[in-house]
A protein has these predicted regions:
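P-loop NTPase catalytic nucleotide-binding module
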Residues: 1-29, 120-262
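P-loop NTPase switch module centered on the Walker A-proximal segment
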Residues: 2-118, 124, 173, 215-217
Length: 262
């Protein structure tokens, strides 16, 4: 029998607003760089570092050991915290290399959810699949981020199909890329009906976040080149018709993952 004291009751609102999640991926998919972006946009840091920083360039916060700095990889799990939208997030950056995977396996027993990072050019890689299976054993909710869309990447539908087939999980798009490779100019936020357009001079920065009124909004034609817009609208129409809608319970059960691109 659990007796709830007045102190426990007083702490409950603070407990309810806390979220702990890990970031998992195959080596070099961009996991630690994404960690820096979470910290940056969460207000925990003022400038994002680089995994392979040279000279006086700022390095990433999670790769703080000398070995990590020298090799440009994560060799141990690192926990960081930030507050965003009245929630307190505990973020754990985990090692991707199989040599250090035991630390990752232990970490995954202590988190609420995981963000799975996929390289847009390589798709589902071996270590990603192993870490996914660890999450699956715990029926853990998984969010997917397909990274490096500004490089030569595979077809968006092919990436989604591979995730569904290799990992046996339903995938529902939460965003959709506008162009790929050199033509990549940002994403359409399908959940909030917004265009997230990148700065052409610095692809790491969102230059514009524009609210639109559906896919027939005239602003689309003003902001997106005609050749990209036509293909984008065709893909969005297919995605909405063919792919499952987001179901919160399926996500919480670990049988469906929403996917973002960037």
């Amino acid at each position: 029998m659990i007796i709830r004291s007045d102190e426990n009751i007083a702490l409950q609102p603070e407990i309810d607003r806390r979220r702990t999640f890990a970031i998992i991926s195959h080596p070099d998919a961009g996991k630690t760089t994404l960690t820096e972006k979470f910290l940056l946009y969460g207000g925990a840091i003022q400038m994002a570092g680089q995994v392979r920083a040279k000279g006086e360039a700022r390095r990433t916060r999670s790769d703080f050991m000398q070995m990590e700095k020298d090799r440009g990889i994560s060799v141990s799990a690192s926990a960081m915290s930030f507050e965003y939208d009245n929630y307190w997030f505990n973020l754990v950056d985990t090692p991707g290399h199989s040599d250090f995977s035991e630390d990752t396996y232990r970490t995954l027993t202590a988190v609420d959810a995981a963000v799975m990072v996929i390289d847009g050019a390589k798709g589902v890689e071996s270590q990603t699949q192993k870490l996914f299976e660890v999450c699956r054993m715990r029926d853990m909710p998984i969010l997917t981020f397909c990274n490096k869309m500004d490089r030569e990447s595979r077809d968006t539908f092919d990436i989604i199909d591979e995730i569904q087939e290799n990992l046996a999980i339903d995938v529902t798009p939460a965003s959709w890329p506008i162009g790929v490779g050199r033509e990549f100019m940002g994403c359409y936020d399908m959940l909030n009906d917004r265009l997230e357009l990148m700065d052409r001079a610095d692809r790491n920065v969102v230059a514009k976040s524009i609210k639109i009124s559906g896919l027939d909004d005239p602003k689309l034609a003003e902001l997106v080149p005609e050749n990209l817009l036509e293909k984008f609208l065709e893909e969005i129409e297919m995605a909405q018709e063919l792919m499952p809608k987001f179901d919160h319970q399926s996500f919480m059960d670990g049988t469906m993952t929403p996917i973002w691109f960037g």
